[in-house]
Amino acid sequence: MGALQSAWGYAKDLDESLNNIRIVTGYSSDKMAEFADKANKAAKALNTTTTAYTDASLIYYQQGLSDAEVLERTNVTIKMANVAGKAAAEVSDQLTAIWNNFDDGSKSLEYYADVITALGAATASSTDEIAEGLEKFAAVAETVGLSYEYATAALATVTAETRQSADVVGTAFKTLFARLQDLELGETLDDGTTLGKYSAALNAVGINIKDTNGELKDMDQILDELGGKWENLSKDTQVALAQTVAGTRQYTQLVALMDNWSVF
């Protein structure tokens, strides 16, 4: 009886998932039958259930994506969900934040998941933790010119060094990078920091935050220049500079990143 109930429940969930896709897409019965067959085959190939596959597909159809885009994203999502041991719905939210903010079309969508998976295997943080941490600051990172490679490596480095969770570090990074974003808009931060003060602190150690055209440099370049000078600065200078750049609440994360620049 238990097996029968389980089978009935599975069939009911699958039917509901497929019906939701039909509602979102407006597909005909024949089109949905074709989709269900393809989903079943894809799910078997990815070692997951058809319902898990269709649930993930539904999320991407709700974003207004094409069949081809949904197929690619669903396959990547299921693969990463299997590695992370998480529900596809949760992983899809994380990957959507990453793709929407970092993907410029130059790399495959799977590349972004592969980077997280590799870092999860190489560090004390899990794939899921790194993805969750990235989700916290992906939007602001893209705005200030922090590349995906820098963002993921910085997150993994600071997480490993401080033993803080990727979620905590990701939230700290969001605040840290948002400072530069707010300053560029002409705001004065809560601690009294202005763009002039921020710029002067870095200028004092030989770093100009603007390029020859007067445009703000990408955060990748600013971090590169700071990392190259860090070990030659006194501890007092390091702390004072980190507090201006990152703020008094987040400066320890910046110090941890700079202290480990050689392995970053």
Question: What annotation goes with each model-predicted range?
Answer:
Residues 1-44, 55-63, 71-84, 90-123, ...:
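Small-residue helix-packing and pore-constriction motifs in hydrophobic alpha-helices
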Residues 31, 69-70, 237, 250:
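Single-residue recognition of alpha-helix capping/boundary positions
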Residues 46-49:
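N-terminal glycine-rich anion-binding loops that anchor highly charged ligand groups
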Residues 203-210, 214-264:
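Hydrophobic, often aromatic-rich secondary-structure segments at membrane interfaces
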Residues 161-164, 242-243:
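Short proline/glycine-enriched turn/loop segments at secondary-structure junctions
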